[in-house]
Amino acid sequence: MASRRGHTPAEVATAVHRLGGTCTWRELRRAVPWRLIARAVDAGLVLRPGNGVYTLPSADDGRVAARRLTGVVSHRSAALYWGWKVKTVPALPHVTIPPNRKLRDSAKGVATTHRRTLGPNDVHESRVTTPVRTVVDCCLDLPFDEALSVVDSALRAGLPRRSLLTAASALGPRNRVKVLQVVRLGSAKAANPFESVLRSIALGMEGTTWDPQHRIRYDDFYARVDLADEALGIVLEADSFEFHGERAAMSRDCERYDELVARGWLVLRFTWEQVMLRPEWVAGVIERTVRRRRVERGLMTDLQRSQAAA
């Protein structure tokens, strides 16, 4: 049944998915009308495993699949188990099994399987990879943007970076480099996977430095933005405010962006669909904006000028 404004409880499940598969009431309230949240829980569209915490019904599928395959919940499914946000909630749970394990035909399609030898210190008693092992596996096996989302979320949840660096140092040279690349770029300041994925795209721009949740201060104005390169004066915003419960909230957003532009900042705003589904386009827009700014500020080298003119 839809609300008077056309909203339905199904939107709550969509919001939880976009918020990384797990979220707080406060995060969810920013995305959907509060009246829909309880209705979505009652309908079984989302679960509330703890006070003020919401997940999707598929959250426990990993342990069911792990028991069936005599494996261990891992990767994105393990990240969700530890309460971390992920870029994409997996359609099938992730389970790690021994390299020489043979699966019966009836077990195929139950999970996305990974083959790896895990030590006793890699597995929690609940048959889920430990937090550190979970991050390492994600860095090794997932695309950069998905791995960065997990690393950011793990750091945000309090997992010490030094524990991840120590684990990476014990790996072989090739795997060590791969894990360290992501762990060193991780930041606890990123609010959610939406921002993490946007940052992963921006990090591909050579010679840029993007600070998450950057604070911009003037004598008469203050703003905290999702990403900023101070030297270039460019702001990137992950525009996730889907539901304005109050017109005042939308007005504050508009005022903030207008003040930034008036002070010389270039502000780029991207929607969830653009960042998650059209990353090449997002990268192109950022690249053209960076090139323009370098020309304006005389920051281009002779090589960059010739490339820009080509």
Question: Predicted regions: what is each one?
Answer:
Residues A2, G6-H7, V32, L155-A310:
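Surface segments flanking catalytic/ligand-binding clefts of nucleic-acid enzymes
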